[in-house]
């Protein structure tokens, strides 16, 4: 059984149907370097034709994906972290140091990636995902999503909104 995907090539004015043979639940999608990457419960997909067709690249369980500095990074359950620096054609498993936590969100900004997860977990990489370090925060609630804009990182989760105290993402505080 195949799933249906919808795509637009005119900024959302009209939509066309494409297909993929995948039936997974997908949680994250991002775009970079003329490539879309979508990921979810059991697959990581790639499209280089604006979403008309999708190819399964690998079978992993990930929740979110971000692109920056010519690198795609996906994060998921049990601290899973995967990186790709060849437009999503191959992926490398990385040690996030967060194996006791699920990582639900990831973003890129100011030449670094920030990922957030269960029990208030915040981690940062300044080398395109090769290594990760903890970020200072007093939050213990799960964090579900993170974004970068206007020179700060903002993360949200269970009854929580926090922001970085500067553009490096080294320390977060409740807002």
Question: Language-model segments: what does each one mean?
Answer:
Residues 1-175:
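Residue-level hotspots at or immediately adjacent to binding/recognition sites across diverse folds
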């Amino acid at each position: 059984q195949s799933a249906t995907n919808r795509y637009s090539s005119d900024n959302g004015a009209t939509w066309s149907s494409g297909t993929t043979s995948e039936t997974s639940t997908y949680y994250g999608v991002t775009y970079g370097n003329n490539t879309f990457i979508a990921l979810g419960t059991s697959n990581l997909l790639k499209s280089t034709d604006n979403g008309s067709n999708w190819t399964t690249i690998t079978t992993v369980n990930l929740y979110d994906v971000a692109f920056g500095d010519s690198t795609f990074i996906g994060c998921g359950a049990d601290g899973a972290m995967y990186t790709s620096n060849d437009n999503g054609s191959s992926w490398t498993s990385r040690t996030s140091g967060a194996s006791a936590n699920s990582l639900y969100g990831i973003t890129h900004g100011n030449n670094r990636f920030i990922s957030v997860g269960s029990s208030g977990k915040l981690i940062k990489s300044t080398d395109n995902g090769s290594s990760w370090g903890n970020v200072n925060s007093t939050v213990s609630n799960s964090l579900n999503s993170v974004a970068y804009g206007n020179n700060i990182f903002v993360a949200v989760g269970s009854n929580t909104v926090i922001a970085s105290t500067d553009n490096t993402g080294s320390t977060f505080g409740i807002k």
